[in-house]
């Protein structure tokens, strides 16, 4: 199963994270399929860069976001776009 999750990058005591699509059986910092964004919680406010189009693609292909990534997607409106896209596809079918 493909998951959209965080992988840690950055120095010791200065974590930053990449938002990636990867197989759920891979270790946290293992081989990823695609980099979908960046998250730095140490800045004020937290720095987040998202590739919305690619995230929506992976979600439409059945990728499951982790709880942390889901909260980021909801905060920036990507999850709402996905749900709207999903319901519009259902109603047109």
From Swiss-Prot:
GO biological processes: translation
Signal peptide range in chain numbering: none
Pfam families linked to this entry: Ribosomal_S16
Transmembrane segments: none
GO CC list: cytoplasm; small ribosomal subunit
InterPro entries xref list: Ribosomal_bS16 (IPR000307), Ribosomal_bS16_CS (IPR020592), Ribosomal_bS16_dom_sf (IPR023803)
Entry keyword set: Ribonucleoprotein, Ribosomal protein
Name of protein: Small ribosomal subunit protein bS16
